[in-house]
Design a protein with these regions (language model features):
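Double-stranded RNA-binding/processing signature
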Residues: 1-235
Length: 235
């Protein structure tokens, strides 16, 4: 059953009074609905494009203000985590935006309103609607209210620097060691087995479906082993 957006529901989502309800309804209108409902003439795609830009800008400024002393690489990685599709889809799910998506009968029957990509798009479109209706300040307030609420975003886990390859490279430089070499030990049944060698000596192995992730896992494994050795009682 299709649920059309009410002004009360829109204002509950945004957290303030709105001006143009049609903008918010468009934010939840999938292009498949345009043929089925003659009252809808535009889908969320344009608003999603605008919202994507606004979200990126606000999160970039937010990270810079809070972590100005951090290196650019860390800030870039943190921003990527905060605006990636997986994060946005989870936020949209927790906001119950799936119940507001308007699409054709086939889409609803196949539960496409719960598709992570569509949830990501409608969240960005909602931000776009707020920006177009109320301006950047209200869009920023909405975004930061969501992102600073641990119910929606686990900021602590996202802000952890989990680029273990970079960490290992810096570790080697501090120790005046040669840089680590990542060697493909095997590629079997869709899994990459990556070995790390430092100064021609094997130090750790990582396994994953992608070569890139296997390298990260191998670097992480190195630090895990070092931590275990440090805490081990040899007596």
């Amino acid at each position: 059953m299709v649920t059309f957006l009410t002004k009360q529901r829109a204002e509950q989502l945004v957290g303030t009074k709105i001006k143009n309800l049609d903008l918010y309804q468009r934010a939840f209108t999938h292009k498949s609905a345009l043929k089925e409902y003659e009252q809808f003439t535009e889908s969320f795609e344009t608003l999603e494009f605008i919202g994507d830009s606004v979200l990126g800008f606000v999160i970039t400024k937010f990270l810079f203000d809070r972590h100005e002393s951090k290196q650019e690489g860390f800030l870039t990685k943190a921003r990527t985590k905060l605006v990636r599709g997986e994060t946005l889809a989870k936020i949209a799910e927790k906001l119950n935006l799936n119940a507001l998506v308007i699409m054709d009968e086939k889409g609803l029957r196949n539960n496409w309103n719960n598709n992570p990509k569509i949830l990501e798009d409608v969240f960005e479109a909602l931000i776009g609607a707020i920006y177009m209706d109320l301006g950047l300040l209200h869009a920023k307030e909405f975004i930061l209210r969501i992102y600073q609420d641990p119910k929606f975003v686990d900021m602590n886990s996202i802000m952890v620097d989990d680029n273990f390859k970079d960490k290992l490279m810096r570790h080697c430089q501090i120790q005046n060691w040669p840089l680590p070499e990542y060697r493909v030990a095997a590629h079997h049944e869709g899994l990459f087995y990556i070995d790390i060698h430092i100064n021609d000596g094997f130090v750790s192995r990582g396994v994953a479906k992608s070569k890139k992730q296997a390298e990260q896992n191998a670097a992480q494994s190195y630090f895990q082993v070092q931590e275990e050795l440090k805490n081990y009682n040899f007596n």
